[in-house]
């Protein structure tokens, strides 16, 4: 896009003098707007300013170094402001049209197959990417759970979760679990960041949070991460199907036998997801207590329901592997 300069002012905002019309797609966490803009009634693009101050230049880096290795599962990057522009950074993408952010197992399986591909990239391809994601690493998350142990116990008691789960929280905080190698992660792969076009194609969006992490990070965001604006109902059968697909696809890409450690990997996932969901419940609970929140409270209540359901289902799946005491107290509400 050689003429991008005529559409963007030096301060990194759209120049209305050379634009036919514009419409807001969504608002970033820093208040800046991602917009579709038309240069004529027939031709449109997507303008994305820096929407998160901690991710400056990262999405462009991922496009330049990573995404060209994959099929067209992402909108094409047409122009950018160049590195080091700070709050004046911007990018322009192709407009892939109206998008549907609706959960289906078919879509999730398509995404997880591509995920296995970027997780299988050797470290030499992503060695220069920043190490931080949009949320704390799992070790920091569980440390916070221990710091807020009194609140955690209240939530666990309310949901009928045995205090035995606190033992696993302490083990993870000590670094005794989740010791696998880190891979390149999308970083924020909830339902709002992948979508179906009108022609039925699946696109994976918003790569500005890409960073090295455990493969469980991306899997949790795809499967069990809830979002106030993009509700979904995850089932145990869908969760199993997505995990099986990921394990088999990863094994095929790496030339290994997927069945060898399938149960162990699933147990790690269920524990990771339960810990992350418990932490998310504390965040949602905090938002619900605020008089003014970023999200409508009815949306937060829906998110609470989805997250608590994921937590309980993952603990029940973990219980299926246990011979002795379980995580779920069967006497509660019986």
Task: List each language-model region with its residue ranges.
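ATP-binding glycine-rich loop module of kinase domains
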Residues: 31-57
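Short beta-strand micro-motifs within the conserved protein kinase catalytic domain, predominantly
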Residues: 76-87
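Active-site catalytic-loop/activation-segment of kinase and kinase-like phosphoryl-transfer enzymes
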Residues: 130-175
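ATP/Mg2+ or Mg2+-diphosphate-binding catalytic cores
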Residues: 273-334
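ATP-binding glycine-rich phosphate-binding loop
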Residues: 14-39
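Conserved kinase catalytic-core helix
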Residues: 98-133
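Conserved short submotifs of the Hanks-type protein kinase catalytic core
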Residues: 86-98
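Active-site activation/catalytic loop segments of kinase-like enzymes and analogous catalytic loops
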Residues: 216-255, 273-294
